[in-house]
Amino acid sequence: MANSQSVRTVVVPAAGMGTRFLPATKTVPKELLPVVDTPGIEMIAEEAAAAGAARLAIVTSPSKDEVLRHFDEFPDLVEILRARGKDEQAAKVERAAEIIHPVAVTQEKPLGLGHAVGLAEPVLDDDEDYFAVMLPDDVIEPTAAMSEMIRVRQEQGGSVLLAVEVDPAHVSSYGVFDIEATGDARVKKVVGMVEKPAVEDAPSNLVATGRYLLDRAIFDALRRIKPGKGGELQLTDAIDLLISEAVSYTHLRAHATDSY
């Protein structure tokens, strides 16, 4: 259950085509591919609920209704499983509908992460000053990272972005942080962000991973930035715009991250 000190809404961009996982994703959305026996989107829902969120705004394409349907109740299936003595499996089927309240947000065209996040603005309540973004591709350790990000926001204010260190040779695949030290070894002040820089131009080897705790002002910034390659709106460009206007950003370093 959400409380006054927790994030209320978590936005999950899930409209991508999943091309890295073809041919499996021809018919099964990437977000429903299992990590062991649990779909990635359900793991995200669990993480969001653990951070106190009450609402999961899932941004999907018109052809990916199955992602939202995963959170439906399946009483007929549960009844069959229980009749066969498969109570453990029945409980797993029931679990998804009990985790969090899902809300569908439709992205008609894949126009970038920033565009997907911007579409979720109407889902937020009028009094929500901040919200979270979780990317379902990234499995984060520790799983309580969002709760720690909320703590950092309460103590220092501003938005909080999760970062990991990568091999400097690979920075051109990520949004890269330009940072300054703070009194906390795990928390740095973000003074800039660069989307997929050349190796020689990268300000650090600390890169954005799939967890963001953002002030509501990001929506206005997304309306003001210009589309980049392919007409896409990049979330990092909107963040960098707000940083240039002296909006406070910090980042918290994760222990590890993986993509599935």
Model-predicted regions and their roles:
Residues 241-249:
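Catalytic donor-sugar/metal-binding loop of nucleotide-sugar-dependent glycosyltransferases
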Residues 227-237:
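Short, charged, surface-exposed loops that flank catalytic or proteolytic processing sites
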Residues 250-257:
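Conserved small/polar residues in nucleotide/adenosyl-binding loops
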Residues 183-203:
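A short, charged helix-loop
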Residues 206-213:
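A conserved mid-domain beta-alpha-beta active-site/ligand-binding segment of alpha/beta enzyme cores
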Residues 2-82, 147:
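N-terminal glycine-rich phosphate-binding loop and ensuing alpha1 helix
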Residues 69, 77-79, 87-180, 214-216, ...:
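Conserved beta-loop-beta/alpha segment of the NTase-like Rossmann-fold superfamily
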